From Swiss-Prot:
SUPFAM superfamilies reported for this sequence: Mitochondrial carrier
Mitochondrial intermembrane side: 1-13, 91-102, 178-198, 278-285
Gene name of the encoded protein: mcfL
One Pfam family it belongs to: Mito_carr
Protein name stated in the entry: Mitochondrial substrate carrier family protein L
Length: 285
């Protein structure tokens, strides 16, 4: 039985997403580790800024400490991106029903927002494990690795940050919207995109994504990295966490870790779309 064109397109999107997730993780994980550490240090002031966080981490824990927690996202981001591109393709096909006309920017952005909430159910547990492992410093460790972490926190712990993750991932409207806009300006006269142009468009998409959701990402990181055995829990929920951040650090607290995030976003998201477009190119319909 020969697969239909629609089925082949779905499979191709899932494969492209898987490859893009691996590329994104390898390119951006060190910056992500610095981001999470700066976001979750609270009022203790462990680090004086991005440069100090980087040098302290290397000095105390070695270079590969920047890749702490990389196992879950290496596999996890591949799964997340696979679901993201696959779901985006399906949602777009449901929203844009008139195939005789090109899909509009508005339809792409609405599709991205819906996709964000769908993907949150996959992203939340994976990123919770990653974040918990990233903030383990030298000394006593709560978790011996991803499996031990999952066993200790359970299903409830894996999904504790689902709501802020949903709001954060909702910004896929900006991600895919910015990528589409960038493509329109960067395409060559024949309509094609080189790998370099795809990389730039991906970097722009990533920048748009983070600019529109970073405060939610800070809240999400705080909730994700709470010790599983803490009683009573530090935060009762997303709103309580937001109030605590504002009370302690003011508005600037919602932008902690933004510098490494911006440094990470171009290489990571550029690599994401280059890998994705390569799969689309080498596995034609």
């Amino acid at each position: 039985m020969i697969a239909s064109k629609e089925t082949k397109e779905k499979i191709r999107n899932f494969i492209g997403g898987f490859a893009s997730g691996a590329a994104s993780t390898l390119a951006g994980h060190p910056f992500d580790t610095l981001k999470v550490r700066l976001q979750t240090e609270g009022s203790t002031g462990r680090f004086r800024g991005l440069a100090h966080c980087f040098t302290t981490t290397i000095k105390e824990e070695g270079f590969f400490a920047l890749y702490k927690g990389v196992t879950p996202p290496l596999l996890g981001m591949s799964i997340i991106n696979s679901c993201m591109f696959g779901a985006m393709n399906i949602v777009k096909s449901k929203i844009h029903t008139d195939k005789s006309t090109p899909i509009s920017l508005g339809e792409i952005m609405v599709s991205g927002a819906i996709t964000g909430w769908i993907v949150s159910f996959v992203a939340c547990p994976i990123e919770t494990v990653k974040s918990k492992l990233q903030v383990q410093y030298t000394g006593v460790k709560l978790y011996n690795g991803p499996i031990d972490c999952i066993k200790k926190i359970g299903i409830r712990g894996l999904y504790k940050a689902l709501i802020p993750t949903g709001f954060q991932r909702n910004s896929l409207y900006a991600y895919f919207g910015c990528y589409e806009l960038a493509q329109r300006y960067l395409r060559r006269e024949d309509g094609s995109m080189t790998m370099g142009r795809s990389f730039i468009a991906g970097g722009i998409a990533g920048t748009g994504f983070w600019l529109t959701n970073f405060p939610f990402d800070v809240i999400r990181s705080r909730i994700m990295t709470m010790p599983y055995n803490e009683s009573p829990p530090r935060y009762k929920g997303m709103i309580d966490c937001a109030k605590h951040i504002y009370r302690v650090d003011g508005l600037k607290g919602f932008w902690k870790g933004f510098s490494p995030c911006l440094l990470r976003t171009f290489p990571a998201n550029g690599a994401t779309f280059v890998a994705y477009e390569c799969v689309m190119k080498f596995f034609p319909m």
